[in-house]
Amino acid sequence: VIHHSYSDLDKASNRFANALMAMGVEKGDPALVVLPRIPEWYHVLLGCCKTGVIAMPGTNLLKAKDLEYRIKRADAKLAIVTTAHAEAVEEIMANCPTLEHLVLVGDEREGWSAFETICVAERDEVDRATLPTTRAEELMLIYFTSGTTANPKMVGRDHAYAFAHSITGDYWMDLKESDVHWTLTDTGWAKAAWGLLYPPLIAGSAILLYDGEGFDLDMH
């Protein structure tokens, strides 16, 4: 069991925010994020939010053609994945002219920026004067629908969306600071936003992350 404090989360997301700015990624640039249930998912999502970069979470079930569709549909400038999807991204890169930056979490690979390397090189504080200003109505997240009857559709969420989930935490989940909250969803589904991310963080609850392979009835 590895424990991370709220202070750890803030500092780690600050490092990634600084890394984004150092790379030249700007406010309004879409970033494809396909990560499992690991702490780095939080660092990336919050770092994007702090810099105005538009995170596009994707489920870990996505294949190369699905990644290509999402990158091209949103004109994504950045892809942040693990080795599980690195080869698929490389396979479709030539078809994605807007894709300029590749970030690999948990490993090193030729042609990729290692997440750990770019973050450790940055400060764990952000200079508020250099951070882009974001407004409540500006785009913060893009989710894609499941595409049951046609191609997946983009669904945008603005910066006010996060604060709106205080209602989710208070009146639906009844979250308290003393609670330990566990949501099993994949990080690419919208449920992750209101199960893994905003309500428990707003409430100050502890969040349990477990990234086992598949669903084990005895364990879960």
Would you name each region that the model predicts?
Residues 1-23, 27, 51, 86-87, ...:
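N-lobe entry segment of adenylate-forming
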Residues 22-23, 46, 50-120:
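Structural core segment of the AMP-binding/adenylate-forming
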Residues 3-7, 140-164:
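Conserved AMP-binding A3 loop
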Residues 104, 110, 122-144, 151, ...:
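Conserved pre-ATP/AMP-binding loop-to-beta segment of ANL
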Residues 31, 48, 79, 139, ...:
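Conserved S/T- and glycine-rich ATP-binding loop of Class I adenylate-forming
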Residues 1-46, 63-68, 116, 120, ...:
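Conserved AMP-binding/adenylate-forming core of the ANL superfamily
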Residues 163-183, 187-220:
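Conserved AMP-binding/adenylation subdomain of ANL enzymes
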Residues 35-46, 61-65, 185-202:
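Conserved coil-to-alpha-helix start sites within the AMP-binding
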